[in-house]
Amino acid sequence: MNLKEKKILFICPRFFGYEKFILEKLQLMGASVIFLSDRAFDKPWQSALTKLFPSIATKLNSILYLKWLKNNNNKSFDLMFVINGQTLSKQFLYEFKELNPHAKLILYIWDSLKNKTTIQKKFKFFDRILSFDPNDSKKYKLIFRPLFFLNNQNNLNKKSLKKSSNYLVFIGTIHSDRYKVIKTIEKALPSNVKTFLYMHIQAPWVFWYYKIFNNMYRNAVKKEFNFLPIEQKLFENLYRNSCAVIDIEHPLQKGLTMRTLEALGAQKKIITTNSDIKNYDFYNPNNIKIISRTAKDYTINTSFFTTKYQEIDSSLYKKYSIDGWIKDIFSTDLMKDFCR
């Protein structure tokens, strides 16, 4: 689909700045884009409340979105592009279609539908639905399309690794059993392997909630965690000076996380709990070590870190780049195969 001069309403959660990169790409392709956050109130602590009380968040969002629609009813759109759409109400989608009867609505889901149960009720409003999760794609007959990495992440391997405290890196939001798995991995590492852990929690009160009500966090210390999302420059520096990345997917999802694709783009090795990764076309056991999230201990040999990363075919980097992702989102004939 040619996006030149197309008017797009882009609705997406604020997620470590990725919404800005997607917006910029759409504009570079010639589209005129208006951005709305998937959460009308999306400060970190508000985001946490959205996860705890999704029905309340949807009602509050609906009021704000309908007000926005009323104030902008003189604007017309060719496309609505939604990522996740957890808090969009049926009324908002209905009124948007009433105001823009010729507009196409596209939905991309980058979470498991088990984690976003309200989205399915809104499928009927969309002309095209894609998912990053292979299981959801099969079950609900959606278009399967994995996530992406940014183009600048594909250059992070250019500088050779020297002495670094960031040999093995974890960057991500702490949820479910992630903290426990990270601690188990730390204990299994060879003595000469160092780590840098950027464990993000939305707000200090969320940490205390976990610590009081979840036994996994009984020995957790507040200073272990970061309460602000990581800045892109720090992220790039950490990846540049590491040789491997820890990836722990949510227990309810099978789709590859953003961190997995970032590591692929940066040509870094991956230690992951997602066994489904072996079904993808870029899988190489030299580059990727699969571990069980339920094991009490692991064996991670030094050789995994010292052996050279084996590059994959250049066509795969193009396929999993943000350019390839956007092209597939708006393509009318996506026939790519991402699995072996």
Model feature map: region roles:
Residues 97-112, 130:
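Active-site proximal beta-strand in glycosyltransferases
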Residues 2-55, 64, 84-91, 117-257, ...:
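Nucleotide-sugar donor-binding catalytic core of glycosyltransferases
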Residues 68-73, 157-159, 298-305:
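Short amphipathic alpha-helix with an adjacent loop that forms part of the alpha/beta core around
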Residues 56-77:
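An amphipathic, basic-hydrophobic alpha-helix
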Residues 24, 265, 269-340:
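Pol beta-like nucleotidyltransferase catalytic core
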Residues 240-242, 262-267:
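Conserved donor-binding/catalytic loop of nucleotide-activated donor transferases
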Residues 10-11, 70-87, 106:
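Short N-terminal targeting/anchoring amphipathic segment
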Residues 93-100, 186:
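Surface-exposed amphipathic alpha-helices with a cationic face
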